[in-house]
């Protein structure tokens, strides 16, 4: 008796299904892939529904005005309007411009250029204290 069988282990002739799969690989790869995609879309439907339900509860939550018991129909504050309202009460006739003394070494006429056209603070006789 021979130690090994003469018939090969993976014989395609033993089952006709294996021959069909070899000729049409879509049966082995395509159908399971499409099945997984369709099945997972149904499985994830519950998770997406939970997400939308949670967002809906956040939108329906109580606002700050309702929480504090304030009226929702009150006047909105406009910063520009409040500024003009507060400045209307101040008289412009009482305003007096006061010059702020500049530090020594800063040009008299602003800017970053220092030269003959912009005298430096502290270098002219009228700027000196002593």
Curated annotation (Swiss-Prot):
GO cellular component: mitochondrial inner membrane
Record region (Disordered): 106-130
Amino acid composition bias (Basic and acidic residues), ranges on this chain: 114-130
InterPro entries membership: Cyt_c_Oxase_assmbl_COX16
Subcellular location per the Swiss-Prot or TrEMBL entry: Mitochondrion inner membrane
Transmembrane segments: 26-46
Keywords: Membrane, Mitochondrion, Mitochondrion inner membrane, Transit peptide, Transmembrane, Transmembrane helix
Record carries keyword Signal: no
Organelle transit peptide: 1-23
Pfam families to which the protein is assigned, alphabetical: COX16
Membrane topology summary: Single-pass membrane protein
UniProt GO BP: mitochondrial cytochrome c oxidase assembly
KW Oxidoreductase (keyword) present: no
Protein family: Belongs to the COX16 family.
Functional summary from the UniProt entry: Required for the assembly of the mitochondrial respiratory chain complex IV (CIV), also known as cytochrome c oxidase. May participate in merging the COX1 and COX2 assembly lines.
Protein name as it appears in the record: Cytochrome c oxidase assembly protein COX16, mitochondrial
Protein's organism: Cryptococcus neoformans var. neoformans serotype D (strain JEC21 / ATCC MYA-565) (Filobasidiella neoformans)
Gene: COX16
């Amino acid at each position: 008796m021979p130690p090994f069988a003469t018939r090969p282990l993976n014989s395609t002739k033993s089952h006709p299904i294996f021959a069909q799969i070899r000729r049409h690989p879509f049966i082995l790869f395509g159908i399971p892939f499409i099945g997984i995609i369709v099945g997972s879309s149904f499985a994830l439907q519950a998770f997406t529904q939970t997400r939308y339900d949670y967002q809906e509860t956040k939108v329906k939550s109580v606002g700050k005005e309702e929480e504090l018991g304030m009226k929702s129909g009150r006047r909105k504050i406009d910063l520009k309007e409040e500024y003009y309202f507060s400045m209307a009460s101040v008289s412009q006739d009482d305003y007096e411009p006061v010059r702020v003394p500049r530090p020594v070494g800063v040009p008299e006429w602003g800017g970053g250029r220092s030269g003959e056209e912009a005298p430096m603070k502290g270098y002219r006789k009228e700027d000196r204290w002593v």
